[in-house]
Design a protein with these regions (language model features):
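Short secondary-structure junction/hinge motifs that connect adjacent elements
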Residues: 27-49
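Single conserved hydrophobic/aromatic residue that forms the stacking wall/gate
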Residues: 188, 195-197
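Flavin-dependent oxidoreductase catalytic core characteristic
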Residues: 2-22, 139-141
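Buried hydrophobic positions in well-ordered alpha/beta secondary-structure cores of metabolic enzymes
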Residues: 9, 74, 103, 144-146
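FAD-binding core of flavoproteins
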Residues: 105-106, 112-190
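Glycine-rich beta->alpha junctions and the first turn(s) of the following alpha-helix
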Residues: 2-7, 12, 80, 179-190
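Short, hydrophobic secondary-structure boundary micro-motifs
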Residues: 28-32, 122-124, 197
């Protein structure tokens, strides 16, 4: 019995690795890190053109209809290089959540646009996984209030998927009135600079 990757999975991995080798050198990553986000967008668009966004979207919604093992192979390829791009939240967690928890109307609304690259998702499930003080997500009177911290893939997302403490999932456009995004930067954090009390 063979437990390795299939030829198709290896081919997909190799294409991603080659793309990253050609487009995400250490110099490019340094430019991104010094506030040149246009390079990050180019890398993300290139990876989307390879199909990372449509892996888990069924064919009936315009995707490739592949399985989680393909997503794992892609994740491994992204991790083997320097890939400053959205993946786990946008193209793994979001499609799986919509497929397993969304209505047919929601599937028709979101999945084709994920597969085409028209939309992408940030994912904030911290309230359900481990609620933090003053971060409660509350849906009341048709409005969603609260905050979610440590949101995955938020840099260029068009939508955010958040959960409340009971695991109910909500989708909000990143252009929604009252929604704010506060980036957290730890790039200059050093152990000796971090006081412990």
């Amino acid at each position: 019995m063979y437990f390795g990757l299939s030829e198709d999975q290896e081919f997909f991995q190799e294409n991603i690795k080659k793309f990253l080798d050609d487009n995400a050198s250490v110099d490019v990553i340094r430019k991104i890190a010094t506030d040149h986000p246009e390079h990050q967008k180019d890398i993300q668009e290139g990876l989307v053109s390879l199909g990372i966004n449509s892996l888990l979207v069924p064919e009936e919604y315009g995707g490739l209809g592949l399985n989680i093992l393909f997503a794992t192979a892609v994740s491994q390829a992204l991790g083997s290089g320097i890939a400053p791009s959205a993946f786990i939240g946008s193209y793994v967690m979001a499609p799986i959540a919509i497929l397993n928890g969304g209505s047919e109307d929601q599937k028709k609304l979101y999945l084709p646009d994920i597969a085409s690259g028209k939309i992408s998702f940030a994912v904030g499930f911290s309230e359900f996984i481990g609620a933090r003080e003053n971060c409660e997500i509350i849906f009341k009177n048709g409005k969603l209030n609260g905050r979610s911290i440590f949101v995955l893939d938020s840099s260029d997302a068009s939508h955010i998927m958040v959960s409340d403490k009971d695991g109910k999932i909500y989708i909000v456009s990143m252009n929604s009135e009252g929604l704010t995004k506060n980036p957290v930067s730890y790039t200059h954090l050093r152990a000796h600079e971090t006081p412990l009390h």
